[in-house]
């Protein structure tokens, strides 16, 4: 990767951290956002599971809030407005924690996370899609590592080197 970076008058250290740029598309194929992801980050699975387990805590401020079909609340009701802002902040913080970056802006920049979509919050659909994506990417990267390791250890597993060099 470092070889592929054009001279940007950058004098620092460039490290390939495995980051990839991913487009977020709706069902019609339209790009609705972009985020950066490191599919080889082994900690991402634990972070995703933590967010999934904490989802009820994240949305707890919304328990007694009437959410409009467009994902908003009555602006005149200060308590509902404050509850929505608190839940949104919790969700954005959790999502940005997941990817250590711009997740919330990328996914929720064009649609409010608590907008209802097919009986669920939009953020639930987004997080489910991300979970499936993480699983596929991680499995693919692990398969690459296993393939590489097996090339180097094949002779030892088959007994080819059992008695040492002769």
Language-model segments: residues:
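Generic signal for short, ordered secondary-structure residues
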Residues: 30, 34-37, 73-74, 86, ...
